[in-house]
UniProtKB/Swiss-Prot annotation:
One of its GO terms (molecular function) is ATP binding. One of its GO terms (biological process) is tRNA wobble uridine modification. The modification Phosphoserine is found at S291. The lineage of its organism: Eukaryota, Fungi, Dikarya, Ascomycota, Saccharomycotina. The gene is CFD1. Keywords: 4Fe-4S, ATP-binding, Cytoplasm, Iron, Iron-sulfur, Metal-binding, Nucleotide-binding, Phosphoprotein. It comes from Saccharomyces cerevisiae (strain ATCC 204508 / S288c). Changing C182A: Does not impair function. Gene3D superfamilies: P-loop containing nucleotide triphosphate hydrolases (3.40.50.300). Disruption phenotype: Inviable. Decreases cytosolic iron-sulfur (Fe-S) protein assembly. This is Cytosolic Fe-S cluster assembly factor CFD1. The keyword Transport does not apply.
Length: 293
């Protein structure tokens, strides 16, 4: 593994136009589902997309993309990302620790230094090539992995992070901690997505609120960050993920037919129109927080 010079962006990220982290305050809010759908939407829009899974103890993206039997190969320029799709306009590739574990049942019992070393290797040793977007799927909460990725990406100037929550108050309370973490490490919050906001009936396609709603919107107003949208639970999306290996269509083609695709297309349009200079401000409380040196 090559050592990255202090103050110099990682050479492996030099060809990447936009770097976006996907964050959540707690587990179980569908963060990896949001990462997957963001990647599929951007690819279907014609962009070259890479996805980096740094949820080291729970890597789920190989399963989400139907790549559980794939492996990472070492090429002359570094680790080669696993290809999900390459079409005439866009492309999609993935890197995950899940490709190195072999068996899905293998557990990862690592202390902080080993996790940090693995993340450094993911940042410096992957041959991404030219990408429009690199999406980084992070673990829930604020852990060693978050601190490591923030430090490793500091000089590569990531665009910021998308924070995923669910409508319930227990989830939105944890999101406040995630927002404060982003402020401390100088990571811009690009917006909040309220996931699992309603349930799409598989028979009539009517969307019904099964939880409370509006928690994500209220958070965005409190912290003056963009509200990107709300995403319902659609059983047909789960069915699509489960059956993708046996389908004659590619995952991107199947997703284009999903009821969730238009929702994420609107979210991506909002994201791409953003002014990157918008600060994060808590209207209820405005503590003076110094960024770490």
């Amino acid at each position: 593994m090559e050592e990255q010079e202090i103050g110099v962006p990682a050479a492996s990220l030099a060809g990447i136009k936009h770097i976006i982290l996907i964050l959540s305050g707690k587990g179980g809010v569908g963060k990896s589902s949001v990462t997957t759908q963001t990647a599929l939407t951007l690819c279907s829009m014609g962009f070259k997309v890479g996805v980096l899974d740094i949820d080291l103890t729970g890597p789920s993206l190989p399963r989400m993309f139907g790549l559980e039997n794939e492996s990472i190969y070492q090429g002359p320029e570094g680790w080669q990302p696993v290809k999900v799709e390459t079409n005439s306009t866009g492309s999609l590739s993935v890197i995950s620790l899940g490709f190195l574990l072999g068996d899905r049942g293998n557990s990862v019992i690592w202390r902080g230094p080993k996790k940090t070393s693995m993340i450094k290797q993911f940042i410096s040793d992957v041959a991404w090539g030219e990408l429009d977007y690199l999406l980084i799927d992070t673990p829930p909460g604020t852990s060693d992995e978050h601190i490591s990725i923030a430090e490793e990406l500091r000089y590569s100037k990531p665009d910021g992070g998308i924070v995923v929550t669910t409508p319930q108050s227990v989830a939105t309370a944890d999101v406040k901690k995630e927002i404060n973490f982003c402020k401390k490490v100088d990571l811009k919050i690009l917006g909040i997505i309220e996931n699992m906001s309603g349930f799409v009936c598989p028979h009539c396609a009517e969307c019904t609120n099964i939880f409370s709603s509006g928690g994500g919107k209220r958070l965005s107003e409190q912290f003056s960050v963009p509200y990107l949208g709300n995403v319902p639970i659609d059983p047909k999306f789960v069915e699509m993920i489960e059956n993708q290996v046996s389908s004659k269509k590619t995952l991107v083609e199947m997703y284009r037919e999903s009821s969730l695709c238009p929702i994420f297309e609107e979210i991506m349009k909002k994201l791409r129109k953003q002014d990157t200079t918008t600060p994060v401000v808590d209207k209820h409380e405005q503590p003076q927080i110094e960024s770490p040196k």
